[in-house]
Amino acid sequence: MSSIETLVEEIGKLTLTEASELVKALEEKFGVSAAPAVMAGAVMAAPAGEAAAAEEKTEFDVVLKSAGANKINVIKVVRAITGLGLKEAKDMVDGAPKTVKEAVSKDEAEKIAKELKDAGAEVELN
């Protein structure tokens, strides 16, 4: 196995928290950002088609705004939705606001939001 393949395998074994820490460390070491670059043409075209884009939105992000009073139930639901371990799910809930799911269909986003709200969480769809 080449060193790159070995590195990819090792990175694949990291937990979500460890991967996040790795990204932060790389950003600091090399002075870069993991945020996607925005193209100038896309920025220029956005204001003109913004109203149409809002109506045609097909993918939504489910954002956990706060856990509310029943944090344990919210952690259980976050674990079920994301497949995270107990510690990672607890860290996500404690660190709210956090994105629970990204780029899901409207139906799935509403279903996830309902599950979280039923558990006592405050949720937002973006």
Curated annotation (Swiss-Prot):
This protein's record includes keyword DNA damage: no
GO biological process terms, semicolon-separated: translation
Regions annotated as coiled coil: none
Keyword check for Ribosomal protein: yes
A molecular-function term among this protein's GO annotations: mRNA binding
CDD domains, A to Z: Ribosomal_L7_L12 (cd00387)
Keyword terms, alphabetized: Ribonucleoprotein, Ribosomal protein
A Pfam family reported for this protein in Swiss-Prot or TrEMBL: Ribosomal_L12
GO cellular component, one term: cytosolic large ribosomal subunit
PANTHER family the record matches: 39S RIBOSOMAL PROTEIN L12 (PTHR45987), LARGE RIBOSOMAL SUBUNIT PROTEIN BL12M (PTHR45987:SF4)
Role: Forms part of the ribosomal stalk which helps the ribosome interact with GTP-bound translation factors. Is thus essential for accurate translation.
UniProt-listed NCBIfam families: L12
Quaternary structure (record): Homodimer. Part of the ribosomal stalk of the 50S ribosomal subunit. Forms a multimeric L10(L12)X complex, where L10 forms an elongated spine to which 2 to 4 L12 dimers bind in a sequential fashion. Binds GTP-bound translation factors.
Family statement drawn from the similarity comment of this UniProt entry: Belongs to the bacterial ribosomal protein bL12 family.
Protein name (database record): Large ribosomal subunit protein bL12
